[in-house]
């Protein structure tokens, strides 16, 4: 089955996406047949999951995936950090899982604030540093996200919710909520790779859309705007803040090993900074191999993501954090989703609830009795381990995460997948 996993071509190392990804010119149309082959592979893989030939696994806690459908940087990691802080403010214990792109190891491990980015990946290292002081947010990386989730929950069993940094296309991890992030280039020319920037066809089903530019069309999901700006101060490796205004007039060497380095350089210049030299490197570039070729008297300035790799060898570098301003309506919508998704209480082995979940119904008394409301609080969807909603009129237990409705017969819920019916899109929107 692994042969059917689509492998899109990588972006040109270290520089902006091809210009033909933004318009449907000759180059894009020439690659269009390959894009159709890629489309077929994507559809075939998704079909294998829908048919049950490939199994998606759920870790037993609500999973929120923050991802994108375009190649290159969309600003997912700052969204994950903002989400983690928001969920903490709501009293939830948050964990973060990721693959750790660009790291030298393929094992499953915890990410600490001082973990080398080369071993855990630059984005996970950045997230761990953000939560070094204050309420802890455990971060785990693994090639398989489900392995990272299980390791995190084994080490931190009190975790209420998991955030997955990237992984919208990682269908092996069953999720409860999907957030798709777009940068200001949107859908580009709308073609799939390699003719365009899309990793999969759009529109696709997601729960929320966050967009830095115009809202992408075609999706019924609620869309909310995002504004990105540079923080007013750069940071030294020791945590000291340096106001950007103080750097005006100084010649700077700006370095960026991100998907869209030109955007970072433009934001620096918009702050009135003088860039004597700009250097764009491949995204996730191993900066341990980087050698400074410019005048060492130039102040070295970089992105916050690059700093976690640059500071061990160049502690004099300044890092400029990115500040994210998300439409408050998004957090209001997220808060409305949260109450029913809190971690469910443990179910005692041998109890009626455990028997029902296992699919062995307890013996009913001869007289009819309604379903005990207390029992509902103990039940979870057997497929996703997510919460259930009782539809009294239809006598069904609704699982939005699994898109299934389980029957309730004589007051007893029958949580068997082969007894459930699929929910329609219209029912999911209600």
From Swiss-Prot:
GO cellular component: plasma membrane
Enzyme superclass (EC): transferase
BP term (GO), one: lipopolysaccharide core region biosynthetic process
Domain of life: Bacteria
Catalytic reactions on record: a lipid A disaccharide + ATP = a lipid IVA + ADP + H(+)
SUPFAM superfamilies with a match to the protein in the record: P-loop containing nucleoside triphosphate hydrolases, Trm112p-like
Involved pathway(s): Glycolipid biosynthesis; lipid IV(A) biosynthesis; lipid IV(A) from (3R)-3-hydroxytetradecanoyl-[acyl-carrier-protein] and UDP-N-acetyl-alpha-D-glucosamine: step 6/6
GO MF entries: ATP binding; tetraacyldisaccharide 4'-kinase activity
Keywords: ATP-binding, Kinase, Lipid A biosynthesis, Lipid biosynthesis, Lipid metabolism, Nucleotide-binding, Transferase
Region described as Tetraacyldisaccharide 4'-kinase: 1-370
InterPro entries reported for this sequence: LpxK (IPR003758), P-loop_NTPase (IPR027417), Trm112-like (IPR005651)
Magnesium listed as a keyword: no
Residue numbers spanned by region UPF0434: 371-396
EC numbers on record: 2.7.1.130
PANTHER family assigned to the protein according to its UniProt record, in alphabetical order: TETRAACYLDISACCHARIDE 4'-KINASE, TETRAACYLDISACCHARIDE 4'-KINASE, MITOCHONDRIAL-RELATED
HAMAP family: LpxK, UPF0434
Purpose: Transfers the gamma-phosphate of ATP to the 4'-position of a tetraacyldisaccharide 1-phosphate intermediate (termed DS-1-P) to form tetraacyldisaccharide 1,4'-bis-phosphate (lipid IVA).
The protein's name: Tetraacyldisaccharide 4'-kinase
Gene (name only): lpxK
């Amino acid at each position: 089955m692994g042969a059917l996993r689509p492998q899109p071509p990588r972006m040109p190392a270290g520089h902006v996406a091809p210009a033909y990804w933004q318009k449907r010119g000759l180059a894009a149309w020439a690659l269009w047949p390959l894009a159709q082959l890629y489309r077929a592979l994507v559809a075939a893989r998704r079909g294998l999951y829908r048919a049950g030939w490939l199994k998606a696994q759920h870790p037993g806690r609500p999973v929120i995936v923050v991802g994108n459908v375009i190649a290159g940087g969309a600003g997912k990691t700052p969204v994950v950090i903002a989400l983690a802080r928001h969920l903490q403010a709501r009293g939830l214990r948050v964990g973060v899982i990721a693959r750790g792109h660009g790291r030298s190891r393929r094992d499953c491990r915890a990410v600490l604030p001082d973990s080398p980015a080369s071993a855990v990946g630059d984005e996970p290292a950045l997230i761990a540093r953000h939560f070094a002081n204050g309420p802890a947010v455990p971060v785990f990386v693994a090639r398989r996200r489900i392995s990272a989730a299980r390791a995190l929950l084994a080490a931190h069993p009190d975790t209420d919710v998991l955030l997955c940094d990237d992984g919208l296309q990682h269908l092996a991890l069953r999720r409860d909520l999907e957030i798709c992030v777009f940068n200001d280039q949107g859908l580009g020319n709308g073609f799939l790779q390699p003719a365009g920037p899309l990793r999969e066809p759009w529109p696709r089903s997601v729960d929320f859309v966050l967009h830095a530019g115009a809202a992408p069309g075609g999706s019924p999901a609620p869309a909310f705007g995002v504004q990105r700006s540079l923080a007013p101060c750069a940071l030294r490796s020791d945590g000291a803040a340096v106001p950007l205004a103080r750097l005006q007039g100084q010649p700077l060497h700006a370095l960026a090993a991100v998907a869209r380095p030109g955007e970072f350089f433009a934001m620096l210049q918009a702050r009135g900074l003088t860039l004597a030299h700009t250097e764009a490197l491949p995204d996730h570039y191993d900066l341990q191999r980087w050698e400074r070729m410019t005048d060492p008297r130039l102040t070295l300035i970089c992105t916050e993501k690059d700093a976690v790799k640059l500071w061990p060898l160049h502690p004099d570098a300044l890092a400029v954090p990115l500040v994210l301003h998300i439409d408050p309506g998004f957090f209001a919508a997220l808060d409305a989703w949260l109450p029913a998704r809190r971690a469910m209480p443990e179910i005692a082995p041998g109890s009626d609830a455990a028997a029902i979940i296992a699919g062995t119904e307890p013996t009913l008394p001869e007289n009819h009795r309604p379903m005990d409301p207390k029992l509902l609080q103990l039940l979870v969807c057997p497929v996703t381990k997510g919460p259930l909603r009782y539809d009294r009129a239809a006598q069904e237990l609704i699982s939005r995460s699994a898109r299934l409705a389980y029957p309730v017969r004589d007051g007893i819920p029958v949580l068997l997948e082969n007894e459930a019916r699929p929910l329609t899109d219209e029912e999911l929107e209600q």
